[in-house]
Amino acid sequence: MIRYFTAGESHGPALSAIVEGMPAGVALTESDINDQLARRQQGYGRGGRMKIETDRAEVLSGVRFGKTIGSPVAMLIRNRDWENWTTSMAQFEDHATEVQKITIPRPGHADLTGFVKYGFDDIRPVIDRSSARETAARVAAGSLARAFLRQLGIQIGSYISTIGPVSEAAAPASLQELLDAGAESLAAEADKSPVRMLDPEAETAAIAAIDQAKADGDTLGGIVELYITGVPMGLGSYVQHDRRLDSELAAAIMSIQAIKGVEIGPAFDNARKPGSQVHDELFAGGEKGLRRETNRAGGIEGSMSSGQPIHIRAAMKPISSLVSPLSSFDLATLEAVQSRFERSDTCAVPAAGVVAEAVVAPVIANALLEKLGGDHMAEIKERLEVYRAALRMRFEK
């Protein structure tokens, strides 16, 4: 089972990630990790932090001669901004009397709840660990599982369909063609846009909306469209709640900072339709074998992969750190004040798509390993080929 842990604060010396359970023999390059980190830093509407950091992962263990060796992979991502925070975020020297405590929580952030939960007298520790800066470590961790899946013909990609008031009118005409080529083709096409949208008209309108929000001291959220292609039928299980593939994917997506909603396929649209217009009809036989002509289930039926592209939609709320502040209060005095501003983005939805790609990779990898077993890439590949061949033979005439 692949699992990972991250550590580090936004303004500390570094972020780190440890990935355990990677099979041996997975080919890996520095670009497999660092290219994903670079994608996370892109996107129109990002803040000043992106001008400071150029994220690169230092792999400390678990890889030899360009292949994983089965032991935990440890990675370090240094924070260049640390040099400006050595006093405020010192690990051992006590600079409490030199640093002004932050006691004004921002509405919508972890500030207040984290302050109360952990008994702090200063919000700074909450800000620095709850920050979405932590997702850099998760993208690095997810890139390992992503490389594993890619070598088995499974690809992950995303694009953005909504930013603030701007939505694409319909699914892009090129979507199916991109998915047929693999979800990474979809991601590559989306990456050509500064807002990762596929519709040029929507892109122009979204950029204008971000500019207006920035001028107003406001922020914007949006919707991520995530696809996973090449997933064989039968991953996950209906037998127990904690083995349901859709629930595991939803949990992974919901763990991303500022994500407040998830649906598998067009779930909320499906809820407004009769069943006869929702369920994907089944066909078998002939050269095409088992097939469906629609994918309103989003690639998951009965909490198991159906063999179609898995489609996940994720709603990101607007970032909670506003230049134009909302009402708050001072935790030290309980006096009403305006909330404070912490350096932030106007819109981070394009980056959220990249993070979403990263966090679902270990979920799919684990479902595949549960189905096939194996400790080395060669035996896993062989078992998957046998399984895919058996599926083809079962439904072809």
Curated annotation (Swiss-Prot):
> What EC number(s) does the entry state?
4.2.3.5
Q: Pathway it belongs to? A: Metabolic intermediate biosynthesis; chorismate biosynthesis; chorismate from D-erythrose 4-phosphate and phosphoenolpyruvate: step 7/7
Question: Which terms under GO biological process does the entry name?
Answer: amino acid biosynthetic process; aromatic amino acid family biosynthetic process; chorismate biosynthetic process
Q: Any stretches that span the bilayer, and where are they?
A: none
Which terms does the record give in the GO molecular function aspect?
A: chorismate synthase activity; FMN binding
Name the UniProt key words of this record, in alphabetical order: Amino-acid biosynthesis, Aromatic amino acid biosynthesis, FAD, Flavoprotein, FMN, Lyase, NADP
Q: Which residues bind FMN?
A: R129, S130, S131, Q257, A258, G302, K317, P318, I319, S320, S321, R343
Q: Which residues bind NADP(+)?
A: R40, R46
Catalytic reactions on record: 5-O-(1-carboxyvinyl)-3-phosphoshikimate = chorismate + phosphate
Which Pfam family, an example, fits this chain?
A: Chorismate_synt
Which cofactors are reported in the record for this sequence? FMNH2
| Cofactor binding note from Swiss-Prot or TrEMBL | Reduced FMN (FMNH(2)).
Which enzyme type, at the first EC level? lyase
Can you cite an annotated GO cellular component?
cytosol
In terms of SUPFAM superfamilies, this protein maps to: Chorismate synthase, AroC
Q: Where is the signal peptide?
A: none
Q: Which family does it belong to?
A: Belongs to the chorismate synthase family.
Briefly, what is this protein's role? This reaction introduces a second double bond into the aromatic ring system.
Subunit structure and binding partners: Homotetramer.
Protein name per Swiss-Prot or TrEMBL: Chorismate synthase
* Annotated source species: Chlorobaculum tepidum (strain ATCC 49652 / DSM 12025 / NBRC 103806 / TLS)
